[in-house]
Amino acid sequence: MAKLYYDNDADLGRLAGKTVAIIGYGSQGHAHALNLKDSGVQVVVGLHEGSKSKAKAEAAGLQVLSVGEATKAADVVMVLVPDTTQAQLYSDEIAPNLKPNATLMFAHGFNIRYGQIVPPAGVDVSLIAPKSPGHRVREVFEHGGGVPGLVAVYQDASGEALQNALAYGKGIGCARAGVLETTFAEETETDLFGEQAILCGGVSALVKAGFETLVEAGYQPEVAYFECMHELKLIVDLFYQGGLSYMRYSVSDTAEWGDYIAGPRVVTSETKAAMKLLLEEIQNGAFAEDWIEENHTGRARFNKYRSTDVGHQIEQVGRELRSMMPFVNPKEINPGS
């Protein structure tokens, strides 16, 4: 049975008199820094020279230092820059300045799990991973709540790494909702699998295939977009609120019957076998090795995949239709960003 911790299991006093360095001030970074600050914790933000986030952090009343200076000043260092830049940043700025008995923290275990960061033996290494985007972590906290999170300990030099990590989890509000104990390996492997097989890879491929099937059969692209992309949110919201059963309760009997008889024909035993292969590649490090190499060699395939999908018909049709629906809060991105 999973072990869950709540506010009464965590002691925020463990962070009293200590300085927490938040390295990075993006989606998660700003939420962690501001929530900790509001919880009475001494926070500094570590950013690279010329960072556009410096003005935002200072406007929020936070002290901004270089990554090296922030690390040197801190008892707890939370690394919240992208996975792809962590290893180099750790080597150049964090490792040389890390206090001998500091706590090194992450919100995702990729670089620890795959050996891109190897911490010194004398420091605690732990993880607090909110299960929500940063803006939501902040928003819910400001309304007196919290989002669920994961906690893990990779290295317990002090003998108190778990308790200290839970204090951090309480400081950002996760312990209000519940913090589930896991491991760096489990968090990393399941997170990557979810992204690849379901949340990003699986859903994107399914939506495109459905759209293409309808358009190739002669149906209007606009109607195909509504059926295969736009209405997906309506169903996912039902999943989010009450799982599969609530979704089926909420849709028509015709839709529910179609769910039962058609779903297994689309997601077949071959699909599940492919999922198992993806998981094996995550577990044995093949995916990580490929992704690390892709970043070291200029991201040629990554950029090609990105530019190809930007030109997909479903994207063109979607932009036009979303412009007619201001209530969905339409977003546009620069394809090169």
Curated annotation (Swiss-Prot):
Its EC number is 1.1.1.86. Residues 183-328 form the KARI C-terminal knotted domain. One of its GO terms (cellular component) is cytosol. Its cofactor is Mg(2+). InterPro entries: 6-PGluconate_DH-like_C_sf (IPR008927), KARI (IPR013023), KARI_C (IPR000506), KARI_N (IPR013116), KARI_prok (IPR014359), NAD(P)-bd_dom_sf (IPR036291). The keyword Cell membrane does not apply. This is Ketol-acid reductoisomerase (NADP(+)). It comes from Herpetosiphon aurantiacus (strain ATCC 23779 / DSM 785 / 114-95).
